[in-house]
C-alpha cells in the first residue's frame, strides 16, 4: 500500500539539510544517513548517500531512475548464504 497523495512524499529533515549544505559547498562528500525510509527526490541526483544496513553504511550513487523510490530499497539488510545442501560430500 502506497502513501496517500494528499500527504506527499517523505524525507527526513536532517537528510534534506545535509543535501542543501552539499549544494552550497563545492566539494562533494559522502552523506551518511540512517534514514532508509526517506524518499529520493530529484534534488538528490548526483550525490552519494551512505545508507545504513544494520551493520555498516553502504554507499549509493543516486541516479535519475531512482527518484520516487526509498533509500532502503537499494541496500539489502540480509545476506543470503544459500539453502542447505546435501551432506553426501562430507560423509
Swiss-Prot record:
Keyword annotations of the record: Ribonucleoprotein, Ribosomal protein, RNA-binding, rRNA-binding
Record GO biological process: ribosomal small subunit assembly; translation
Signal sequence segment: none
GO terms for MF: rRNA binding; structural constituent of ribosome
Name this protein carries in UniProt: Small ribosomal subunit protein uS19
Recorded family membership: Belongs to the universal ribosomal protein uS19 family.
Function: Protein S19 forms a complex with S13 that binds strongly to the 16S ribosomal RNA.
Coiled coil spans: none
